[in-house]
Amino acid sequence: MKTLIIYSSQTGNTKMVCEKAFEYINGEKLIIPIKEKDSVNLNEFDNIIVGTWIDKANANAEARKFINTLSNKIYFIGTLAASLTSEHAKKCFNNLIKLCSKKNNFIDGVLTRGKVSKDLQEKFTKFPLNIIHKFVPNMKEIILEADSHPNETDFLLIKDFIDKNFNS
């Protein structure tokens, strides 16, 4: 089995968890940023894992556009600041499933936490939260808590995801 991990990363969170996934996968594998998608023949891969950061409760635009070009057996790894048990995370997970299932044989996905970009954190200090992001009363708490992610807890989620889908 040959697996491609292809990711879009704004802050480095998604790149980091995708690199962990790459370490954990047994067998033939390749990892590249989506920007390098034209350097590979996607038809050579049995499995494609798309790494994305969450933007407006879905894959970011670059990853979304790429997923819409696929018709393969795919998986996703997503990173977001919100707690993984939050309603927002559940909505994101379901939106990613819908996106990945449109034209593909979607198999499985996993979300991990990641820190908020410094640029967005700065915007939050200059403008009312509801102008930039849907108003969430505890947004500052979420941002501060997310700052320690991705961490070992997130990497364990990735390891479990890889072991379940690729190494069993």
Q: What is the meaning of each model-derived region?
A:
Residues 1-2, 46:
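Short, surface-exposed connector motifs at secondary-structure boundaries
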Residues 2-24:
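N-terminal beta1-alpha1 ligand-phosphate binding loop
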Residues 6, 32-34, 112:
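Conserved beta-strand termini and adjacent loop/short-helix elements that scaffold enzyme active sites
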Residues 8-12, 36, 53-57:
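Short, surface-exposed acidic/glycine-rich loop or hinge patches that mediate macromolecular interfaces
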Residues 12, 38-40, 83, 118:
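Flexible, glycine-rich phosphate/dinucleotide-binding loops
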Residues 24-30, 45-50, 55-168:
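FMN-binding flavodoxin-like domain, especially the glycine-rich phosphate-binding loop
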Residues 27-40:
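A short, well-structured beta->alpha microelement
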